[in-house]
Amino acid sequence: SSSSFNNEGSPSISGWTTSNVLSMANMFLIASFNQPIGSWDTSKVTNMQQMFAGAVFNQNIGNWDLSKNTFTLAMFSNNTSFNNGGSSSINNWNVSGVTNMSQMFANATSFNQPIGSWNVSNVTSFDLFMVNKTNLNYSSTNLNLIYNGWSTKNPKTGLTINFGSIKYTSEGSAGKAILTGSTLSGGYGWTITDGGI
């Protein structure tokens, strides 16, 4: 069972040649795996759906190349450990090809990194993106960065996204207003669930 997989505690898995791998979907689903794999070549991977869902993985994978990726659906859902190894480098991910980010950080209670730089212009589904997250585990500062960053990325219109009960502040109000604003007035018509201001 993958639930106990941790490569026998050896970091040697970091040396795997992954340059031709196309899918890493479900790879460490519900696994106790937590080895450094930040050096993996993910440049051809198109699917990372549920890759670390329900796992205890918490390593820095901020240098991964996601440029060919289209699915990060539930990638870290129910992973209560993941915070990119404490590094904000995940903000540098090229997610410009991703179309489905539904449940990506749902119930991911440790994740608290900025992702406002992500190019989310091709995402068509954000359903339950950060459902059940709170200000105890995601900062208003980082939510402000999402609102102010993503509102400049020309995202798809009419999307629904859930940030649990995370609050934003006046610093994020302008960005949120653009995302939720009417498409007739230059907004994107999003329906956003958050904890208010």
Where are the regions that the model predicts?
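Negatively charged
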Residues: S1-I197
